[in-house]
Structures are given as C-alpha cells and as structure tokens.
Amino acid sequence: MTLGGLKPEVHAANDEIRQVVAKVADELKSKLNTTEVEPVSYKTQLVAGTNYFIKVKTPAGFAHARVYKDLQQNHSVHSVKADGITEESEIVYF
C-alpha cells in the first residue's frame, strides 16, 4: 500500500464502515446537528492510520464526514461538510 492520496475507488457502505460510524455516531450527530446518520459510501486514505471519507445520509439530506482511525484503533471525527452535499456529490478530500 502507498501512503498519501485519497484512493479514487468509491465503496458502498459495508459492515466495517457501519462500525466506524457507530463508534463516532454521537460526535457526528452533534457536529451535523441531527438525530440520525447512516453511512452510504466511502473512500479511504492511508496515513499514519486511516482517514475515512464517508458519505452519510441524515434526515435533512446528505453530508460528508472525515473520520480518522489512528494506529491504536481510536476513532475521531476530523471534520464534516454538509453544505451543498447531495446523493450525487463526489467524495473528495476536505
């Protein structure tokens, strides 16, 4: 595996990503001011750990979340982007 750039492949949400979102659900809900988040699709970036760029569905629409998993397997929400995100929006680095 190479370190660095965001991988171009978009993957449908799977059990691994649902678990990642579940681990940070409260933080995501707070940052997005919502009561529900459901992962839809994602991309990854290998760094000193893994960045997950996840498209999530909320009652208000869609958002992108950047979740970091460090080498000790701790998860945290790095950032979220909701403005202008639609179901068709490409997942890009932010």
From Swiss-Prot:
Q: Which GO terms describe its molecular function?
A: cysteine-type endopeptidase inhibitor activity
Q: Where along the sequence does the record put site: Reactive site?
A: G5
Q: Where is this motif: Secondary area of contact?
A: 45-49
SUPFAM superfamilies per the UniProt record, alphabetical: Cystatin/monellin
One Gene Ontology term, aspect cellular component = phagocytic vesicle
Q: Which cysteines are joined by disulfide bonds?
A: none
Keyword annotations: Cytoplasm, Protease inhibitor, Thiol protease inhibitor
Q: Name one GO biological process term.
A: adenylate cyclase-activating G protein-coupled cAMP receptor signaling pathway
Look up the domain of life of the source. Answer: Eukaryota
Subcellular location per UniProt equals: Cytoplasm
The family database entries (Gene3D superfamilies) matched by this protein are listed as: 3.10.450.10
Pfam families (alphabetical): Cystatin
Primary role = Intracellular thiol proteinase inhibitor. Inhibits papain, but not cathepsin B.
The record's comment on protein family reads: Belongs to the cystatin family.
The molecule here is called Cystatin-A1
Organism field: Dictyostelium discoideum (Social amoeba)
